[in-house]
């Protein structure tokens, strides 16, 4: 029997195999030029019959162009539920979004940097609290779609000297991996792997020979929001120039130092596991295909 519960205005199916906690705070973070911090939370999913054994953790990061989105979107709930069903812990996180009425190329870049900061903070939060959540810190994976994938990519690859100039004038935007309390700041950001669905990097030269994180890239070849090759984000001139999954894969292949997988889907557009992108309704068959790819990637890259 599956029950329904209202979470943040959305009806969410409750699975008897999965326990969930909603709205758990993990960080307080600032917007540029504002003194007031915002509360960032996560929803946590785990197997209902979980033992005291340490589990892998998957941290999921929603999409929405850095303009909108929520940790309780249908795909995030489904990812986390499915991972909990196979014995993992999973957490769907908040991150800072673009302030209202400030849509521009510079603001998107700045917001992308803040989102990358928040991804890093979430990873280090769970490392610092691994005993409480029974997490195997050697088996933490990241999964993001669209803007969520972009945030993960830049958290993985951006060095301090590569951060955008748009972020440097604000004391509220410290170095990428420096947010959090003292215990969290003492943790490294490193993860076991990242599953990146229809994401991009703003400069492929950020991907260096010293990268060590395995990545799984999934992308539709007809994507016009974040192209699989390269082009302006949203296909709008003046927006940030984006280098998609095929460019990133070619860069990783050229370097030859990081395990990676590239899964291209012919005739598929952006966020193709949704039936209708504007309504965020999942296509069960396409989502299941992505889940199988992600699960198999994790099994191949688990660190004991």
Predicted regions and their residues:
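C-terminal catalytic histidine-bearing segment of alpha/beta-hydrolase fold enzymes
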Residues: 242, 246-304
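Cap/lid segment of the alpha/beta-hydrolase catalytic domain
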Residues: 66-75, 94-113, 158-159, 268-278
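The feature captures the conserved acid-bearing segment of alpha/beta-hydrolase catalytic domains
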Residues: 171-255
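Short amphipathic alpha-helix adjacent to the substrate-entry channel of hydrolases
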Residues: 72-92
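N-terminal cap/lid segment of alpha/beta-hydrolase-fold proteins
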Residues: 14-53
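Alpha/beta-hydrolase fold nucleophile elbow
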Residues: 133-144
